[in-house]
């Protein structure tokens, strides 16, 4: 099958292209050329910006694909441009959505594909919801099938590991060296990373399998864990000491570090569990890469490419840890002294 991937060089896009090629598909990747890719031989690379409709139109015309996999659409306008260009050419359009589309906190767990999406949790989520709606409105089972996949926290080779204050790789060195790691709240909210190779398998299913058009799919972890467990398991994977976790209330972190806590605001503070049974049944999705194995793979790649920053590249973590410990010690001491 001829498959056209928009954004095939990102973390997840690379995994999807690799699996598509391994499954015997002919793949064309539209990419800006700003990132060195690690795609298999035989992939046709087209340089260009999908935000320029003339570029996308020409690339689709030349490739004449049967299926498009779109990893880089974030709003309704971009979606409608893609629909106008592709609907008379391709048989199926696979759109990479996100679990961000679900309202937080969810009214109940586990979250299914029919759980409420509004009000949006962020501007990013609102854009993705609008894009989904545009694609579903264009769905035609007889000529332009639309499939939407909603991944959660996807990680893997070539990327880093998330933590309360972001995605900087100095977190890894902090874990290794036993330095303070900031954790929001009491560390018991839930999180669920899923390796990109497992997520990519679901995308291949969305390309290949009949009867999946017009549907959305959660493609999510089956190792849901608390944030305390997350850090403990990263440490165990790296043979590091027990992590020095410093628990700081979410609202305090948001107040003192707004630029570092967007993901905390929108996601990390909530306990959410996702139902992925539809993706398993329809797309052949399977969760096969255990989290600690995936951590070792990620860190090995970063080590090989000399991309693990030293722990002290993130002084904010140390400043926050010291300030919070000092203030709580003073607070407790004040009560003990009766002041």
What kind of region is each of these model predictions?
Residues 205, 209-264, 276-278, 297, ...:
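Mid/C-terminal beta-alpha module of Rossmann-like enzyme folds, strongest
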Residues 163-172, 183-207, 215:
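Substrate-positioning beta->alpha
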Residues 109-133, 162-169, 192-193, 224:
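Short-chain dehydrogenase/reductase
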Residues 6, 156, 184-189, 217-224, ...:
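Glycine-rich Rossmann NAD(P)(H)-binding loop
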Residues 98-122, 137-142, 159:
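Active-site "gating" loop of Rossmann-like NAD(P)-dependent oxidoreductase/epimerase domains
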Residues 61, 66-107, 132-134:
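NAD(P)-cofactor binding segment of oxidoreductase domains
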Residues 3-23:
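N-terminal Rossmann NAD(P)H-binding glycine-rich loop of SDR-like oxidoreductase domains
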Residues 132-160:
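Conserved beta-loop-beta element that borders a ligand/cofactor-binding pocket
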């Amino acid at each position: 099958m001829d498959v056209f991937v928009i954004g095939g060089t990102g973390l997840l896009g690379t995994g999807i292209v690799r699996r598509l090629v391994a499954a015997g598909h002919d793949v064309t990747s539209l990419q800006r050329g700003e990132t060195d890719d690690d795609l298999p031989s035989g992939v046709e690379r087209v340089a260009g910006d999908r935000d320029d409709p003339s570029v996308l139109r020409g690339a689709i015309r030349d490739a004449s694909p049967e299926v498009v996999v779109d990893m880089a659409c974030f709003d309704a306008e971009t979606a409608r441009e893609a629909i106008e260009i592709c609907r008379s050419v391709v048989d199926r359009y696979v759109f990479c959505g996100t679990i961000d589309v679900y309202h937080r906190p969810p009214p109940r767990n586990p979250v299914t594909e029919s759980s409420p999406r509004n009000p949006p949790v962020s501007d990013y989520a609102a854009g993705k919801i609008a894009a989904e709606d545009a694609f579903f409105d264009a769905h035609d089972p007889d000529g332009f099938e639309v499939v939407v996949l909603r991944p959660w926290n996807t990680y893997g080779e070539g990327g880093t590991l998330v933590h309360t204050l972001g995605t900087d790789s100095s977190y890894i060195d902090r874990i290794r060296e036993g330095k303070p790691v900031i954790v929001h709240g009491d560390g018991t909210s839930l999180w669920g990373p899923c390796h990109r190779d497992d997520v990519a398998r679901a995308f291949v299913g969305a390309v290949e399998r009949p009867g999946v058009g017009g549907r959305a799919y959660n493609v999510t972890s089956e190792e849901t864990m608390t944030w305390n467990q997350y850090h403990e398991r990263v440490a165990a994977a790296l043979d590091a000491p027990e992590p020095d976790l410093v628990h700081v209330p979410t609202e305090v972190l948001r107040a003192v570090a707004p630029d570092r806590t967007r993901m905390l605001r929108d996601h990390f503070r909530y306990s959410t569990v996702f139902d992925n049974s539809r993706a398993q049944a329809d797309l052949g999705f399977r969760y096969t890469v255990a989290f600690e194995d995936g951590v070792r793979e990620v860190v090995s790649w970063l080590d090989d490419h000399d991309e693990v920053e030293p722990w002290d590249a993130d002084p904010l973590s140390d400043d926050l840890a010291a300030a919070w410990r000092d203030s709580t010690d003073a607070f407790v001491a004040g009560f003990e002294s009766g002041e």
